[in-house]
């Protein structure tokens, strides 16, 4: 899970971790985890926090090493990124769905895809649109749009 973090996120977590490990022991007490998460904007109730700590503190030492800490924090950071991406895609879809009827035409989708990757040939675009608009309706709803933009379930 922690390999999904960017270098910037890892550096941010390292700084937060080090701030709570002033003796440089290489671990923080589990009691500090809630404090750090709330500083990162995540308020958790005691039961949820205890569950998360129990899951991450695999050796039950009451101490969280940096690796355990990044695994724990990655859940929140990656989740946040996914939510932010979803909101951005919703907004992008709304911009192209000018009539507000919940779908865009395949012509509009073609423009979007071309803007995202100008190396796509007309054949590439035709194949992609054929796959996306499997019912041949000439329209793409938000769910289909999301599948295209996020790579679907495969």
Curated annotation (Swiss-Prot):
Keywords noted in UniProt: Calcium, Metal-binding, Muscle protein, Repeat
Tissue-specific expression: Present only in adult muscles.
Domain EF-hand: 8-43, 44-79, 84-119, 120-154
Similarity annotation: Belongs to the troponin C family.
A GO term for molecular function: calcium ion binding
Protein name as annotated: Troponin C, isoform 1
Matching PROSITE patterns: EF_HAND_1, EF_HAND_2
Record-linked Pfam families: EF-hand_7
Binding site for Ca(2+) 1: 57, 59, 61, 63, 68
Residue positions binding Ca(2+) 2: 133, 135, 137, 139, 144
Organism: Drosophila melanogaster (Fruit fly)
Regions that span the bilayer: none
InterPro entries: CALM/Myosin/TropC-like, EF-hand-dom_pair, EF_Hand_1_Ca_BS, EF_hand_dom
Gene giving rise to this polypeptide: TpnC41C
């Amino acid at each position: 899970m922690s390999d999904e973090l960017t270098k910037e996120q890892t550096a941010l977590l390292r700084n937060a971790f080090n701030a709570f490990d002033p003796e440089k022991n290489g671990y923080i007490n589990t009691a500090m985890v809630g404090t750090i998460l709330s500083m990162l904007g995540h308020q958790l109730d005691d039961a949820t926090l205890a569950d998360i700590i129990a899951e991450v503190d695999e050796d039950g030492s009451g101490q969280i090493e940096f690796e355990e800490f990044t695994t724990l924090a990655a859940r929140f950071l990656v989740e946040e990124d996914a939510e932010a991406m979803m909101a951005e895609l919703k907004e992008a879809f709304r911009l192209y769905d000018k009539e507000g009827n919940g779908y865009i035409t395949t012509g509009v989708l073609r423009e979007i895809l071309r803007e995202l990757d100008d190396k796509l040939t007309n054949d590439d675009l035709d194949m992609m649109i054929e796959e996306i608009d499997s019912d041949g309706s000439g329209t793409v709803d938000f769910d289909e749009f999301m599948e295209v933009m996020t790579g679907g379930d495969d």
